[in-house]
Amino acid sequence: MNPKSNPDTIFSAPIDKIGDFTFDERVAEVFPDMIQRSVPGYSNIISAIGMLAERFVKPHSNVYDLGCSLGAATLSMRRHIKQEGCQIIAVDNSKAMVERCKLHVNAYRSDTPVNVIEADIRHIDIENASVVVLNFTLQFLSPEDRYVLLEKIYAGLRPGGILILSEKYVFEDQVSNELLIDLHHDFKRANGYSELEISQKRSAIENVMRPDSKKQHKERFAQIGFSSYDVWFQCFNFGSMFAIK
């Protein structure tokens, strides 16, 4: 479950000069509302991440949530982890997100410890991992950093370990791509966002979020050496994949 938050009104008034989107204090305050109203199927993905973790986590192993934001995926996994000696390492480079994540994590009791770290995920060591989650995070890295991070994750996964990668997708067929973008905008309108909010948010985020196609993701997985990989969830141009070592 996601923590409650204030309503997202960040882009509701006209902005003269729209800067790049950042996960700052303002965004952290409204993030649960923002992501529920912006990402189709988000709650389903969070719930299923917990179920996948339950299947794949091994005793005395590490579980990583890279780009943890407020800890929704971390909390979902922690509810499902029954194995002994496991710890969740939740990492985000936003101080505002990390501070709130710690509050959310500490609000629930569990036998599985969670270590919330403020750091750049590109500089985190991945060791003895049975589960690694990148939930709408990879798309914010530069294209050249994505392969390097995935290689590091693969090296740090135990055999049989799983990477769960949720992303926004771009589609190679132009008609399909435009249709799915339009459907996503319809989804946002249905959730109360105005045309101004949709337009300004898109302008703010287009320079910092550069989505890949599913084909690009699968090609990377194959090149790195993952044995099995596929899409397990998709709604419009958002989805989630698994890759097993």
From Swiss-Prot:
Catalyzes the conversion of S-adenosyl-L-methionine (SAM) to carboxy-S-adenosyl-L-methionine (Cx-SAM). Its EC number is 2.1.3.-. The lineage of its organism: Bacteria, Pseudomonadati, Pseudomonadota, Gammaproteobacteria, Vibrionales. Homodimer. It is an enzyme of class 2 (transferase). Pfam families: Methyltransf_25. Keywords: S-adenosyl-L-methionine, Transferase. S-adenosyl-L-methionine binds at Y42, G67, C68, S69, D92, N93, D120, I121, N135, R202. GO terms for biological process: tRNA wobble uridine modification. GO terms for molecular function: carboxyl- or carbamoyltransferase activity; S-adenosyl-L-methionine binding. This is Carboxy-S-adenosyl-L-methionine synthase. Belongs to the class I-like SAM-binding methyltransferase superfamily. Cx-SAM synthase family. It catalyses: prephenate + S-adenosyl-L-methionine = carboxy-S-adenosyl-L-methionine + 3-phenylpyruvate + H2O. The keyword Transferase applies.
